[in-house]
Amino acid sequence: MKKTFESLLAVLFTLCGSASFGAEKAPVDYVNMFIGSCGPHVTEYGGTTPAVSDPFGMTQWCAATRLNKISATMYHHADDRLIGFMGTHQPAIWMGDYGYFTMMPQSGALRTDPEQRAVPLERDTECGTPYYYTVSHTEPDGSRIRTEFTATSRSSFFRFAYADSGAPMLMIEAGRMCEGGGIEIIPERNEIRLYNKERFDAHLGPRLYRFACYYVLRFSEPFADFGTWTDGTVSEGRRSDAAPNVGGYVRFASDVRTVEVRIGSSFIDYAQAADNLDREIGRERTFEQVKASGRDRWNRELSRVSIKGASEDDLTVFYTAFFRTLQYPREFSEYGRYYSPFDERIHEGTSYTAYSLWDTFRAQHPWLQLVQSERGDAMVRSLVQMYEESGWIPKWANPTFTNIMIGTHADAVIADAYVNGFRGYDLEAAYRAIRKDAFTPPTRDEHYRWGDRDFWNGGYEARAGLTHYMKAGYVASDRTDESVASTLEYALDDYCIAQMAKGLGHMEDYRALMERSRNYRNLYNPQTGFFQARRSSGEWDADDVGFTEGANWTYRFCVMQDVPGLIELMGGRDAFVKALDENFDKGHYRHDNEPGHHYVYLYAHCDRLDKIQTRLPGILAANYRNSPDGLSGNDDLGQMSAWYIFSVMGFYPLTPASGEYALGIPAFEEFELALSNGNRLKIVARDRKKHQTMEVVRFNGKRLDRPFIPVREIMQGGVLEFSTK
């Protein structure tokens, strides 16, 4: 039996990442699921996992090597153990999971505690793709178990192969924290139903009384034995239980060697979970059929971009980055209905969640406009629905308010979509939502300092310190935390809202907001050449006060909306270029976090395309590699990856809602994009390897006279050509 088991493994790994021997690799075959899954620091790395789902899938499925929490994902490539397999909704390393559960195939004695059930992770048996994952392990009794799973958006299909086992079983953990969950075992139907009410971020947002994720598990084999457990105490034969730390188990006949489990998930109820499972996997489709369909779906999306002149490593890094941008925001609706975590009702319509807006407004959302335009209106509409259901658009929906980060960057996402032609939502409702961000301070604004990740105080933070910002033109450091960063980002959001106001004819708002978009000037200290905190009295505060995830160098160039004005403040083009050079040459630039992601493209406003082109290769090489530690910072729901994609293609969305891209330089000789609006864009840089700079840029044969190109021209398709003459 063991020899047969290992032979099956050999076949399995042959087929894991490719269609067949001798076949040309497809884009999906280049994806390395483990890039960014570890790093030199416990939290400062990619924070990615080899989770399996459909593009933008509602529920992801992932091997667990540790207990996840805020600041730790469930999988880390440096770990040497396996504690289970999870249905998870944790979107990022610094955000919490919710509505999750864990399974662990076992043999012999039941082990419920994560430390007791941990087994060595056999890395040489592990294989992960966007649509499939497998790994094998050895149980304490010496028997071997292979786990495989594939997934759709709301469902999954697991296959457990038990070799040399006289007591095959599956352990299930439905809850492990205060909110807990419940489990019901239905042996007559070979079925388990469970729910989980936990939200790791619950202390950062409002209480949800009706929240739960429901799961329906259908087994291919009957249960020979079953029971539940709470806090490690086992109740043999018990069919149901509910508690903070709760789970169950099922045993199979001693001669069972393969068990298949089909799982549906839902935030509505068990009936919807079963319906999702029926729609996406059903009862008749085989594991191989579901896996093949998942591969086809991912490959169809990834095939929207083709590349010439790139190495195997380059293609791997690119398509892995592309894959990461197709995970978020994630679907939250279920075939025409969705549970709202804002008013706790069931609504009709389409919904998305997991909007890491402080990060993703910069490049992730602009990238999706090009390659997922069919989802663009629905993603904006989801934000508007949140406003209609709660009175505000959250800064970080996970899945409800969390008061994480600063700024109200849904303003930038919505206005940018509007400027770039996305109009399939209630325009005036969208404008009312972002206008409220600009003109309505949070409740008891001046009573709280609004520290990052403060416990929920009963109100949404929105723009903390907006009261003083509207009076004096800046957020006061003696009243509100993160005052410098907030002032700079409110000014950007004001600019973005102003562009939508202008388009909709709200000219009084437009003029007021454009004036406010220059509020960054109020914190610029000409004596130091840096932005600096001010107290409510107008006096300068200490130069290390008021920043978010950085210091004064991190925010020195954090003005996207009025770069000419910033250049003037800093003494003109020559002085500005010199300051940018110092930023890069003296080690001040940090690509591992978002505030500086646009900095290299600021050279475009000084007509120094050559500076952009000579610096980009070094930034790319230092921060993106084909290895588990290949991301220098948290991917943040696709932002790090989207920056890479734009930057290797030769243009970047420097200023949201401006309607234009700044130019860079393609990293490879040719790209071809099948834009999701049906147009095609070709990017050409012939003999790229021979030239460090290619400053002559033409679009459809016409030479560009400045290092920018309109977004709408790119969307219309054509040929963008870089050359030396």
Predicted regions located by residue number:
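Bacterial Sec-dependent N-terminal signal peptides
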Residues: 1-24
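Accessory carbohydrate-recognition regions in carbohydrate-active enzymes
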Residues: 23-412, 418-488, 496-522, 528-531, ...
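ATP-dependent phospho-/nucleotidyl transfer catalytic cores
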Residues: 493
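Conserved catalytic core of nucleotide polymerization and phosphodiester-bond processing enzymes
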Residues: 672, 685
